Amino acid sequence: MKSLQALFGGTFDPVHYGHLKPVETLANLIGLTRVTIIPNNVPPHRPQPEANSMQRKHMLELAIADKPLFTLDERELKRNAPSYTAQTLKEWRQEQGPDVPLAFIIGQDSLLTFPTWYEYETILDNAHLIVCRRPGYPLEMAQPQYQQWLEDHLTHNPEDLHLQPAGKIYLAETPWFNISATIIRERLQNGESCEDLLPEPVLTYINQQGLYR
């Protein structure tokens, strides 16, 4: 049986412990040996990043340098068009073949808006969804047809993610860290400490580059 590959996308502006620690816990919970981080270049759902793509890439490299669980995929950074998860997962599926189990990691907030994503209905054709639970967010989708979609694909057994190549949604009980890139940027702008929010090499680089001031 081929091992489950997991992808983790985002803007990472900047990368912080709220990104890394839940995924590290997730890896232990469901038996992931490798998580590929895919930073967006031009995120279609959010304002443009404050740090440029190369700065965000370098911060990620610093953050995961001592973490063998993580590796970096730059394909979306090399696009000059918006980064769409559906497109990236189609590419990954074509590269890996039809039988390799593949999963995409998202937060619970993203699950609730998932039906607004570009070609969202194709994503489960190519991968599983692993959802990191977050307090304060409902477990139900906003509309009945999307709730039915969720229930049709939902599994409570993480082993299903390893046994099938795609098509399942798993809600993972991961720790919640009240950290966001927005909070970090605001604290940096106000000259407040962020030492407990992100890896030290990343903070050193931010200060050296004068980012988020």
Curated annotation (Swiss-Prot):
User: One GO biological process from the UniProt record?
Assistant: NAD biosynthetic process
Which Gene3D superfamilies does this UniProt record tie to the protein?
A: HUPs
Q: Which InterPro entries match?
A: Cyt_trans-like (IPR004821), NadD/NMNAT (IPR005248), Rossmann-like_a/b/a_fold (IPR014729)
The UniProt record lists the EC number as 2.7.7.18
Keywords tagged on the record: ATP-binding, NAD, Nucleotide-binding, Nucleotidyltransferase, Pyridine nucleotide biosynthesis, Transferase
Q: What class of enzyme is it?
A: transferase
In which pathway does this enzyme or protein participate? Cofactor biosynthesis; NAD(+) biosynthesis; deamido-NAD(+) from nicotinate D-ribonucleotide: step 1/1
Q: Catalytic activity, per the record? A: nicotinate beta-D-ribonucleotide + ATP + H(+) = deamido-NAD(+) + diphosphate
Single GO MF descriptor: nicotinate-nucleotide adenylyltransferase activity
Stored NCBIfam families: cyt_tran_rel, nicotinate (nicotinamide) nucleotide adenylyltransferase, PRK00071.1-1, PRK00071.1-3
HAMAP family linked to this entry:
NaMN_adenylyltr
What family does the Swiss-Prot or TrEMBL record give for this protein? Answer: Belongs to the NadD family.
PANTHER family linked: NICOTINATE-NUCLEOTIDE ADENYLYLTRANSFERASE-RELATED, PHOSPHOPANTETHEINE ADENYLYLTRANSFERASE
As for what it does, the entry says: Catalyzes the reversible adenylation of nicotinate mononucleotide (NaMN) to nicotinic acid adenine dinucleotide (NaAD).
* Name of the featured protein: Probable nicotinate-nucleotide adenylyltransferase
Organism name: Escherichia coli O1:K1 / APEC
* The encoding gene: nadD
